[in-house]
């Protein structure tokens, strides 16, 4: 497997570096910046699992650490403010750097702080979950939730580099592993059916090298897409398959009942059912999706009686993908994807949605 993928960005190019030696790779990335101040942003789970690694950071660099509570509720302006306070207290300048080491929440949060502190300081991502390695760290999207709404405030702000080490996945709980598989299945189902089929048949326990190949293949797909459409005006919209409903579920469940990959799995099933109902997708493809989600213990139906189709529809109206009058869904087709525009006043769609959940 190649050690580096180079990502072209209209904002700033960056490298995705594959390694088993995080400390050495980070040192190589920093270069002359080794003498600058570094703020490592992480969460309590990662900090306790890899405390020795953070101790080595402290020995080698002028390093500070900010440790967040785990979970989606840390993606908040309150947490951003706390990190700003630490940066100001330690007199961080535009030439100093943030390094995120954690899952998607930590990466999105730290990237947003980097994008906005002094109108932008450099940062490096070290994603530690499967989902963050194959999806959220790539493409420059950073942001936080606001008033319960998912990723409501954010920007496109690429990192200096992304360091991928599959050794972090050895401590990843099965639930989090399945959430990462969910995003890999998403990109495979829309853009790379051979990848989808390989994931369907993959045996995690006996094929570590196979996992590395699948991760590389998933990342390569996302790299290709974001290079063609960095600001989500066309092709990159396809990566929102499952996300209109998934983000609404996360918002209504306060970002703590379902993990991101689980909410997106439910969203993908509903999008696929819509596609089947419009004869855009063969029912056999929907059945295949349901089977592979079941294999990875991903939910396929909404299990919260307090979350109704009506409440979901109200949250849809705040989605970033919307046009002025329409809610946008991404539907899979036999050969790719298409968009479905639902009028914001179409209450008949609420009944349709209720039948699909």
UniProtKB/Swiss-Prot annotation:
One of its GO terms (biological process) is chorismate biosynthetic process. Its EC number is 4.2.3.4. Binds 1 divalent metal cation per subunit. Can use either Co(2+) or Zn(2+). Its main location: cytoplasm. The keyword Transcription regulation does not apply. Pathway: Metabolic intermediate biosynthesis; chorismate biosynthesis; chorismate from D-erythrose 4-phosphate and phosphoenolpyruvate: step 2/7. InterPro entries: Dehydroquinate_synthase, DHQ_synth_AroB, DHQ_synth_fam, DHQS/DOIS_N, DHQS_C. NAD(+) binds at residues 104-108, 128-129, 141, 168-171. Its cofactor is NAD(+); Co(2+); Zn(2+). GO terms for cellular component: cytoplasm. Belongs to the sugar phosphate cyclases superfamily. Dehydroquinate synthase family. PANTHER family: 3-DEHYDROQUINATE SYNTHASE. This is 3-dehydroquinate synthase.
């Amino acid at each position: 497997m190649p050690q580096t993928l180079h990502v072209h960005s209209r904002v700033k190019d960056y490298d995705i570096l594959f390694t088993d030696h995080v400390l050495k790779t980070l040192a190589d990335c920093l270069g002359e910046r080794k003498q600058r101040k570094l703020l490592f942003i992480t969460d309590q789970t990662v900090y306790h699992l890899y405390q020795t690694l953070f101790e080595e950071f402290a020995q080698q660099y002028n390093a500070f650490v900010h440790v967040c509570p785990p979970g989606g509720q840390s993606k908040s302006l309150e947490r951003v403010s706390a990190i700003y306070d630490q940066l100001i207290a330690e007199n961080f300048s535009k030439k100093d750097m943030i390094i995120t080491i954690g899952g998607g929440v930590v990466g999105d949060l730290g990237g947003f702080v980097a994008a906005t502190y002094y109108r932008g300081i450099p940062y490096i991502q070290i994603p530690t979950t499967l989902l963050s390695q194959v999806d959220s760290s790539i493409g420059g999207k950073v942001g936080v939730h606001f008033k319960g709404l998912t990723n409501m405030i954010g920007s496109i702000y690429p990192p200096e580099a992304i360091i991928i080490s599959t050794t972090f996945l050895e401590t990843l709980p099965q639930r989090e592993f399945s959430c990462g598989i969910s995003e890999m299945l998403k990109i495979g189902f829309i853009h790379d059916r051979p990848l989808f089929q390989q994931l369907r048949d993959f045996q995690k326990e006996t094929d570590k090298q196979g996992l590395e190949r699948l991760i590389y293949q998933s990342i390569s797909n996302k790299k290709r897409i974001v290079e063609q459409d960095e600001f989500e005006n066309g092709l990159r919209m396809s990566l929102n398959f499952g996300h209109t409903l998934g983000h609404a579920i996360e918002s209504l469940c306060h970002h703590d009942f379902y993990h991101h990959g689980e909410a997106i799995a439910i969203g993908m099933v509903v999008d696929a059912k819509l596609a089947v109902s419009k004869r855009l997708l063969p029912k056999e493809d929907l059945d295949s999706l349901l089977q592979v989600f079941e294999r990875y213990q991903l939910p396929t139906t909404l299990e919260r009686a307090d979350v109704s189709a009506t409440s979901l529809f109200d949250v849809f109206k705040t989605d970033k993908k919307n046009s002025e009058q329409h809610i946008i869904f991404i539907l899979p087709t036999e050969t790719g994807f298409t968009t479905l525009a639902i009028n914001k006043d179409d209450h008949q769609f609420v009944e349709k949605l209720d039948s699909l959940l």
